[in-house]
Amino acid sequence: DTTRKVAEVLTASGVDFGIMGKKEKSAGNDVRRIGEEGLFEQLAEQNIENIELCEFEEIVTTDPHTYNTLKNEYPKLGGDYTVKHYSTLLLELIESGQIHLSKKLDIASTFHDPCYLGRYNGIYDAPRRLMEQCGVELVEMPRNRENSFCCGAGGGQIWLQEHADMTQRPSEQRIEEAVGLGVGTFTVACPKDMNMYS
């Protein structure tokens, strides 16, 4: 749903973009993390081959895991691209005047730093500045930026069923931290975070 909404914003803003459609496969982050190196390389090679057939200046992704894989792991396999997370692109478009916001949200929210956007790639400010541009008062959780708390998805929690001996999932701890701030909105910038915090 996030990808569809970003595409709608880009279309309304007159940005020239395209999608690969059925030729786009998983970037391979998850299979690589569980040790399927051969499958990762196969996916990467297929993606690189298909990407090379396209005319583009940069790749924009709505998933920090994919962002990290394309930016930091594909170059070793011959796929060296300019890659952006959508929060960076949208902020650039707002600040350049290509996107005009007709109204502000006027809400307070906290923001959860996705591991593969923040901790592994140092992107902390773009999502926060984007929120502020949209009229969001940012209320930081105690653990933020470099000290943010992992939702657990990247460590495999997204694939596990709850067990009787599991007292509390990492995502539940994080939600409690956010609820303690007294804000009504919890903002994320990663599809795995959306899954873990839903």
Model-derived features with residue positions:
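Iron-sulfur cluster-binding electron-transfer modules in prokaryotic oxidoreductases
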Residues: D1-S198
